[in-house]
Amino acid sequence: MMEAEEQPWKTTFYSKLPKVELHAHLNGSISSNTIRKLIAKKPDLKIHDQMTMIDKGEKRTLEECLQMFQIIHLLTTTPEDVLMVTKDVIKEFADDGVKYLELRSTPRGEDATGMTKKTYVESILEGIKQSKEENVDIDVRYLISIDRRGGSSAAKEAVKLAEEFFLSAEDTVLGLDLSGDPSAGQAKDFLEPLLEAKKSGLKLALHLSEIPNQKTETQVLLNLFPDRIGHGTFLSSSEEGSPDLVDFVRQHQIPLELCLTSNVKSQTVPAYDQHHFGFWYSVAHPAVICTDDKGVFATRLSQEYQLVAETFHLTQSQVWDLSYESISYIFASDSTKADLRKKWSHLKPHF
């Protein structure tokens, strides 16, 4: 009985905790409320919201999760759709106590509606701008995603767009994300555009070691010295892990973006208590808790922090430190980091 009474208070701690979200795919972060608004605009598609979300206790294969994105893409085909989605997602993160957010999304053109990759990016930037003008209490930046399925030519196009907006979008576009189906393409296809991006001053967040048996692929990407690693699920696992890869990541102190619900629901990790957060936390390696796709996986960042705390027996003080330390891994400037640290200090409860 006591535990049930404590639960709302505990939940309040996690939702009030100021948080940084560094691994959030825009289209995967669309809530069921927003999905319903999009469905209402396109009734002929005969899509219902259960086709885009994995409920509590349910699981899908990674492949099935990726297929859900195809459905979501059918719903976001105009600049107006993208603008609405961006604003809704930003507001929902802010409502969950997220104070700094790096959204990521692959620029997408739609011949039928006339949306180009450039207007897609502009719609996201407009959503960020309007949210700021409406005083939503969150600092939002954008990473342009390279979808592995698009191959080298789409990657080069994404880098060009990122370079263009990096110079013109007032510090909003900060870097690139390499993501999409981890079995599509090869790392070497993306080396040239990613190196070009690095030379331009863009930051790199690379999904790697998401699936087993990718040691060579992982090493190729690590040789780029990415600024952050997405998932890194099999870097440290006893069956597939490689001590030299782990040593490389530790030696270069490359932060990991870790997404518990996503990994368990997509079955790349068998159970929460076997999540690789445990390994990296035990060696005091930089790691940041993230949602990945809060819409698809029906989660919130406060829920992810609660999961981590309860699974790995962290105190409130340790949870606070985990959140505070994540400020160090953002792609924005040192002055932004200093502002966020001030904000955290101001909001810090007495433990």
Curated annotation (Swiss-Prot):
EC annotation from Swiss-Prot or TrEMBL: 3.5.4.-
Active site per the UniProt annotation: 210 (proton donor)
Site feature (Important for catalytic activity) residues: 231
Positions of N(6)-methyl-AMP binding: 25, 27, 73, 105-108, 147, 180, 210, 292-293
Catalytic activity line of the entry: N(6)-methyl-AMP + H2O + H(+) = IMP + methylamine
Cofactor details (free text): Binds 1 zinc ion per subunit.
Cysteine pairs bridged by disulfides in the record: none
Cofactor(s) essential for the protein: Zn(2+)
Ranges that cross the membrane: none
Keyword Iron in annotation: no
One GO term (biological process): inosine biosynthetic process
Binding site for Zn(2+): 23, 25, 207, 292
InterPro entries: A_deaminase_dom, Ado/ade_deaminase, Metal_Hydrolase
Keywords: Hydrolase, Metal-binding, Nucleotide metabolism, Zinc
Top class in the EC scheme: hydrolase
Subunit field text: Monomer.
Family: Belongs to the metallo-dependent hydrolases superfamily. Adenosine and AMP deaminases family.
Function: Catalyzes the hydrolysis of the free cytosolic methylated adenosine nucleotide N(6)-methyl-AMP (N6-mAMP) to produce inositol monophosphate (IMP) and methylamine. Is required for the catabolism of cytosolic N6-mAMP, which is derived from the degradation of mRNA containing N6-methylated adenine (m6A).
Descriptive protein name: N6-Methyl-AMP deaminase
Organism for this UniProt entry: Bos taurus (Bovine)
Phylogenetic classification of the source organism: Eukaryota, Metazoa, Chordata, Craniata, Vertebrata
Gene that encodes the chain: MAPDA
